[in-house]
């Protein structure tokens, strides 16, 4: 089975077409049905709730029974300094599986790197309902899709 290309999911403001942020998955492992995710939001769109909206839509999409490739697990890494990313992943049930000590240099400082995972069964058992409610509460559901 071939490794699928990196897939980008983008949150776009309907009225202007402006890209508010994105989540990607890459390094799909067909033996373990896992992939690494990463997310990015331009500075002007941070701390406005767009990360939660995009993560909810992304997880609902990739853990849907009909979605291919099938994912058993998603995982991510982030620096210990990145409290916004840590908060976002923990809010959506990602588990901190490990720490790589003194791994990430930023502005002359060394930080630990955290590894987070979310299993399909954890999402389906614990998070699916609240994520769907978050999405349905939006007055204007942003356009979301593969780019």
Regions found by a protein language model. Name each.
Residues 8, 12-147:
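Acyl-donor (CoA/ACP) binding surface of acyl/acetyltransferases
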């Amino acid at each position: 089975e071939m490794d699928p290309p990196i897939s980008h999911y983008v949150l776009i403001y309907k009225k202007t077409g402006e890209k508010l942020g994105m989540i990607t998955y890459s390094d799909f492992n067909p033996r373990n049905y896992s992939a690494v995710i990463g997310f990015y939001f331009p500075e002007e769109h941070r701390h406005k709730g767009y990360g939660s909206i995009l993560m909810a839509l992304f997880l609902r999409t990739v853990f849907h029974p009909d979605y291919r490739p099938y994912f058993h697990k998603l995982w991510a890494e982030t620096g210990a300094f990145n409290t916004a990313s840590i908060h976002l992943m923990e809010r959506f049930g990602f588990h901190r599986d490990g720490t790589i000590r003194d791994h990430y240099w930023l502005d002359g400082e060394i930080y630990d790197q955290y590894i987070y995972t979310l299993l399909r069964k954890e999402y389906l058992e614990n998070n699916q309902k609240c994520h769907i409610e978050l999405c349905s509460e939006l007055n204007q559901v942003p356009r979301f899709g593969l780019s």
